């Protein structure tokens, strides 16, 4: 039985909404840097846009479309929700590590932690959708053979 559309929509919208927050926050951070209001490394802007906006939107949309294409349901909504937290924490940690006027030794743990969380989120996403695709296609193939 497919995952209810209400649940898929909720997960997708959570990713997309948060992604658009990053889309707006990134240019604000960049503008603050250009105007001298804040001293911010521009790498922080790119982290916000790539991981905060692009990755969040891609993750959210894939959780909506992949189950339908694979004739199944998301393997784990819980993993999708945990992943939402880890990608956000990783993006925020990496943005903070790259944005401040800190010495590299001070920001290194924050940077490594942020990258580790982003990587963990990507691995969770890949595993969750791989299981979704495999189980959905197996179920679909067995129904086709029975018909």
Indicate residue ranges for each PLM-predicted region.
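Hydrophobic alpha-helical transmembrane segments of multi-pass integral membrane proteins
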Residues: 1-147
């Amino acid at each position: 039985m497919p995952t209810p559309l209400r649940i898929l929509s909720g997960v997708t919208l959570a990713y997309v909404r948060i992604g658009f927050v990053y889309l707006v926050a990134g240019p604000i951070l960049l503008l603050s840097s250009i105007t001298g209001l804040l001293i911010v490394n521009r790498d922080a802007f790119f982290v916000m846009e790539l991981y905060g906006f692009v990755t969040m939107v891609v993750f959210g949309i894939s959780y909506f479309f992949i189950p339908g294409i694979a004739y199944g349901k998301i393997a784990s909504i819980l993993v999708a929700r945990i992943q939402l937290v880890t990608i956000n924490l990783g993006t925020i940690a990496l943005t903070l590590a790259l944005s401040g006027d800190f010495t590299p030794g001070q920001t290194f743990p924050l940077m490594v932690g942020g990258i580790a969380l982003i990587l963990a989120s990507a691995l969770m996403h890949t595993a969750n959708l791989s299981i979704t695709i495999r189980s959905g296609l197996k179920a679909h193939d067995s129904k086709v053979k029975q018909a």
